[in-house]
Regions:
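Short, Asp-centered acidic motifs that coordinate Mg2+ and/or phosphate
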Residues: 12, 46-47, 127
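Glycine-centered tight turns that cap/initiate beta-strands
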Residues: 7, 44, 121-124
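Hydrophobic alpha-helical segments typical of transmembrane helices
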Residues: 1, 9, 20, 35, ...
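Beta-loop-alpha module in the N-terminal Rossmann-like domain of NAD(P)-dependent dehydrogenases
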Residues: 30-90
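Acidic-histidine catalytic/liganding microenvironments
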Residues: 5, 42-43, 107
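N-terminal Rossmann-like dinucleotide-binding module
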Residues: 1-28
Length: 171
């Protein structure tokens, strides 16, 4: 997606798997690395996007933060409170911005719901509830990291974020 945005310049990509980085280098004509610290040491990077599997966000996040780079982490920030607290503590220590990509906030239907709830005539919401009614087959056999995450992490987290956003409060 970054290659489609005229306001971004994809500088480098890092993945532990050399086969993946070789394919990306050829497909996107971009420098690739298999070590995040090497990439951060050698490239002029304004910000880092972290799109590792859910349970593996912490190490690249901490590396980028320690290099003073703001990060955008695919949701969820972490799969444990301990990892999330470590990331946020380091971000505070290094005065680095951390953002989590809760992209449902940009869906037109979600924006309409929030706007309606912000309307004075709607009153003040006192309770939030969301349900994902669709039967979604999560292809856990495709993910070699599936045992380290769950649908709550990669799907349910949207519900928590939307309730918080809709109601203007922390959950």
């Amino acid at each position: 997606a970054y290659t489609w945005n005229p306001n971004t310049n994809l500088v480098a990509v890092c993945d532990l798997n050399k086969e993946i980085t070789d394919r990306i280098a050829e497909q996107y004509n971009v420098k690739t690395y298999n070590d995040v610290n090497e990439m951060l040491d050698n490239e002029e990077i304004d910000a880092v996007s972290i799109a590792t599997p859910d349970a593996f966000h912490m190490d690249p996040a901490l590396a980028a933060i320690r290099h003073g780079k703001p990060i955008l982490v695919e949701k969820p920030l972490a799969t444990t409170s301990e990892d999330a607290k470590k990331i946020l503590a380091e971000a505070e220590k290094y005065n680095v911005r951390v953002a989590v990509d809760y992209h449902k906030r940009w869906d037109p239907a979600a924006i309409n719901v929030r706007n309606e709830l912000q309307n004075e005539e709607s009153g003040t919401p006192i309770r939030g509830y969301m349900c994902m009614d669709d039967i979604i087959d999560v292809p856990t056999e495709w993910f070699n990291w599936a045992d380290k995450s769950s649908p709550v992490h990669f799907l349910g987290t949207h519900c928590y974020d939307q309730i918080r956003w809709y109601m203007g409060c922390e959950v």
